């Protein structure tokens, strides 16, 4: 098997894992919000923060914002999960759609939650490492795997 195919398959597996984790996180977040447990949703997201520090009465608008975040986690996970099956075969559009969707989602996560010190390495930061690795492997395969050797 060519290295290009191995890289596409590696990227696909990484995006499947990343997508499933985000689908699940979205479902959990929306479930907390829909049950009125806004503190539980926040504690689930900012898992490095003592849950007692976020235990309070939040206005319904805050719950709506957190619920929207959960929905975003869910659909971003769905998109990257679906893209993974197309990346397996080297589909250029899927490579870029997953990179833009998952990559930008994790950039925001990194800037506001990781750098803020609000999350633990697992599962949060490791997911950023996984999406970065998925992007790098698929981009490398796409941009360098198609080069033909020049004849001397």
Please describe what each predicted stretch is:
Residues 1-152:
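Topology signature of small-to-medium multi-pass alpha-helical membrane proteins
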């Amino acid at each position: 098997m060519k290295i290009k195919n191995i890289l596409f398959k590696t990227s696909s597996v990484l995006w499947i894992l990343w997508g499933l984790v985000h689908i699940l996180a979205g479902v959990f977040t929306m479930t907390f919000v829909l049950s009125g447990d806004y503190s539980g949703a926040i504690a689930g997201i900012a898992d490095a923060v003592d849950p007692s520090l976020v235990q309070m009465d939040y206005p319904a608008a805050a719950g709506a914002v957190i619920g929207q975040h959960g929905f975003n986690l869910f659909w971003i996970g769905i998109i990257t999960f679906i893209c993974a099956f197309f990346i397996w075969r080297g589909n250029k559009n899927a490579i870029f759609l997953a990179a833009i969707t998952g990559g930008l989602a994790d950039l925001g996560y990194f800037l506001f939650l990781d750098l803020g010190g609000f999350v633990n390495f697992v599962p949060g930061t490791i997911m950023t490492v996984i999406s970065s690795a998925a992007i790098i492997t698929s981009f490398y395969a796409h941009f360098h795997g198609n080069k033909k050797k020049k004849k001397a």
